[in-house]
C-alpha cells in the first residue's frame, strides 16, 4: 500500500555517501558507499573508506564494516548470493589488503560473509582510470562486475584507440574470487556503465550511456542510452541504443522471472 515502515539515518561527524543497496534471502538489507571519517565501533583505514552496513528487516543495524587502503576508496555496488555472502565493488586509489595498485584508480571486489567477516578482496586495473560501478550474481553464485576503464583491461584494446576514451567492462569471478574472464567494449568516444542484471539463464545485461556509436547502432544525440546482453561465457549477444536529440542517461536495469 506504499506506507512507510521505518527510516534509519547513518553517518559520522563528516560527509558520508551511500550508493548501493541490496537484500539477502532472509530480507536483511545491505548498504554500501564511502565515508570521509570513521563510523562508531569501526576503525578508519586512511583517506576515504568504503563501508558495508547490515540491517535486519525491522531496520535494526546488525553490524557495520569500514575497509579500504591507506588512500581513498569508494564503494559503489553491492549484491548478495544464495548463501547470503555479500559482494561489494567500487574503486580505490591505493592497494587494498595484499593487492597491488596498477597505477591509478583501480577496481576492487570484496566478499563478506553474513556475519560481516571479509573473505577476500580482488583488485584489478590499468595504468589509467578504472572504476567498479555495479555487481550481480547468477544462480551458481558467479560474480559479475561492471564499470568503466580508460585503458585496456587484461589485454583488451581500448575502442578509443590512442586517445584512450573510456570503455565499459564486464568481469566474471567465481565464488572463490578467481577471475574467469574480462570483456571490454566501447565506441570511439566516451562510454560509461552503471547498471547490471543477470537472468535465470545466467545471461548478463548491462546498461549505461555512450557519446559515440556502439556496434552497428545509430546515434541520436549527445549522450545515448545503451543496453548490452552477454552470455555467461562473456560473448556479446546483442546491443541496443536509444535516445533523443539531447542527453539521455541510464543507471539501472532489472529482469523478471520470464527473462524480460
Predicted regions and their residues:
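A sequence-level/structural motif corresponding to short, flexible coil/turn segments enriched
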Residues: 1-260
